[in-house]
Amino acid sequence: MHGFYVDNIEVRALGEMGRGSDNLRVLYWNIQNGMWSDQANNYNNFVAWVKKYDPDICVWCESATIYKDNTNSAQASSARFLPDGWAALAARYGHAYTAVGGWRDNYPQTITSKYPIETLLKITDSDQAGKPVSHGAAIQRVTVKGRTINIVTLHTWPQAYGFGVGSADQAASAANKEGDKYREFEIKYICA
């Protein structure tokens, strides 16, 4: 098992957050491989789900279409709807603004919003050769009713073994928790 663990935190339901004029609703979700399970349905289930929660800002991890509908067969690049189609998709749930963060593979993060978005920085590489930010990151600025909000998007390395480790060495790398160490490296680089 790998991942981040936080001890001594109590989580309590405080009830539903109202739609007051000073509240900002943010939805941050990993939609897994560009939501390939809803592609054949024109993303109608996804749009209905987002509308149900009516967020002001959304951040979507893995926001590129990479597989054919509901399969693990690669989608031809020319047939991929996302990430280029985010403006059209976001408009269906009421978001007029979109921005795709830095990405170097098939797993970008996309931010959509009811408010203007400015991309401050797209991040794909770090200051160490051979150690990129595996799925990219971005620093985005959203202006909400005259207030500036900076949002950092990051989708860390997901494997138990370290980034770039060959298949013959992956078990040993996982045993040494190199995947966790790589995630820590990515987070520290982004936050520095």
Residue ranges and their predicted role:
Residues 7, 27, 138-140:
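Hydrophobic residues positioned within well-ordered beta-strands of beta-sheet architectures
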Residues 15-91, 103-106, 187:
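N-terminal, active-site-proximal structural segment of metallo-dependent hydrolase catalytic domains
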Residues 161-184:
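A solvent-exposed, charged loop/short amphipathic helix patch at secondary-structure junctions
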Residues 61-161:
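Structured beta-strand-rich core segments of catalytic domains in phosphoester-bond hydrolases
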Residues 192:
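Metal-dependent active-site segment of extracytoplasmic phospho-/sulfohydrolases and closely related
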Residues 23-36, 121-123, 148-158, 172, ...:
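Active-site-proximal beta-strand elements of phosphoester/diester hydrolases
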Residues 1-13:
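Extracellular carbohydrate recognition
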